């Protein structure tokens, strides 16, 4: 009997989350209410609180899987041993378009991300942003230090500068996803504009770091 009750509870939670997703996408986070979500799920407003404390908890659970994808990318950056790479491999990291891999990974979650960025959903995004940028900054700092150590670059960047660069990249990605034209996926026009902006940033880095190592083929 207990197993049946637990299974029923699981099914109800899944129904509520699906209804919450529908309401969030339809009305936006601010206009969504527990009452609207309950009505969509076909349960009473009081019953919904047996499963969730509020809409922020629901949104957090909806975004959890998507957040895990992003965190898996940044987690893979932790502890990368750049010293094990050849000079050619090390330089190629600079032109590897990691940001495009990130966007491709998130393509199926674009509606949810668009809704998140268009509406104030509490502190969830702020917490995620902090962790994401912190990890990206550490990854980049280790990378630039290795370039300098080998003499491939002639200048070191400060941690604060690297933090600001990581923040800028994160902000550009967020601005792109938040654009109404990208609600159902990144458009080719927006993708081209973003790639061009990242190319400008890359060329600036090349000049500032005075990178003097030639790679074969296209750099970006």
Predicted regions and their residues:
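Helix-turn-helix
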Residues: 4, 15, 19, 23-57, ...
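Hydrophobic/aromatic-rich alpha-helical bundle segments in the mid-to-C-terminal region
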Residues: 114, 147-201, 209-220
């Amino acid at each position: 009997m207990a197993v049946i009750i637990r299974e029923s509870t699981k099914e109800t939670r899944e129904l509520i989350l699906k209804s919450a997703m529908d309401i969030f996408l339809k009305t936006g986070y601010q206009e969504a209410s527990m009452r609207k979500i309950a009505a969509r799920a076909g349960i009473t407003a009081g019953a919904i609180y047996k499963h969730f404390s509020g809409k922020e908890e629901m949104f957090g659970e909806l975004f959890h899987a998507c957040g895990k994808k992003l965190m898996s990318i940044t987690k893979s950056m932790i502890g990368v041993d750049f010293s094990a790479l050849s000079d050619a491999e090390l330089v190629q990291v600079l032109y590897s378009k990691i940001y495009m891999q990130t966007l491709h990974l998130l393509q199926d979650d674009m509606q949810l991300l668009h809704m998140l960025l268009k509406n104030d959903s509490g502190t969830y995004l702020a917490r995620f942003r902090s962790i994401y940028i912190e990890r990206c900054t550490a990854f980049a700092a280790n990378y630039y230090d290795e370039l300098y150590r080998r003499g491939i670059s002639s200048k070191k960047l400060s941690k604060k500068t690297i933090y600001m660069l990581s923040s800028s990249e994160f902000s550009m990605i967020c601005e792109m996803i938040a654009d109404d034209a990208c609600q159902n996926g990144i458009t080719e026009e927006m993708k081209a504009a973003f790639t061009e902006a990242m190319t400008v940033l890359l060329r600036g880095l090349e000049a500032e770091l005075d990178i003097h190592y030639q790679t074969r083929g296209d750099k970006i």
